Design a protein with these regions (language model features):
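Helix-enriched interaction subdomains in cytosolic or periplasmic regions
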Residues: 2-10
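An N-terminal structural lobe/cap that precedes and organizes the functional/catalytic core
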Residues: 9-116
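Conserved small/polar residues in nucleotide/adenosyl-binding loops
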Residues: 117-123
Length: 123
């Protein structure tokens, strides 16, 4: 199993392993976000991925928004280079429940990631 757009095409394999997958058309959300961005978040760390990105995932799954998240990182740009980009901006959220069960979710609400090392500012 590979956490990427290509790897997630085999949804049955992921679901058989107990992963909850995005329930929205990610390609359409990505296109809508690029055309009319609504939410850019500065800081791509664990708290963002576990909370804000997951909230947006739930909103997208319910069809309440058409655009996803853009995440920008200026301090720890390696998060973008080593985590986001190799996995097409997907992440995995693992939640340990009070009863000891584990919930595994592939989060796909982040559709674009940028780091300040790749921004070209006008002179």
């Amino acid at each position: 199993m590979e956490l990427s757009t290509l790897g997630l095409k085999d949804r049955a394999q992921w679901e058989a392993k107990g992963y909850q997958l995005p329930q929205f058309d990610r390609a359409a959300v990505t296109e809508a976000t690029r055309e009319n961005p609504c939410w850019i978040h500065f800081g791509a760390g664990n708290i963002f991925r576990a909370f804000q990105a997951n909230v947006m995932q739930n909103i997208l799954n319910r069809g309440e928004m058409e655009t996803g998240l853009i995440v920008a990182e200026g301090f720890d740009y390696e998060i973008i280079e080593k985590m986001n980009r190799p996995h097409d901006d997907y992440s995995i959220l693992v939640t340990l429940k009070a009863d000891g069960s584990v919930e595994k979710t592939v989060v796909g609400s982040v559709v674009e990631s940028v780091s300040y090392t790749h921004l070209t500012l006008p002179t």
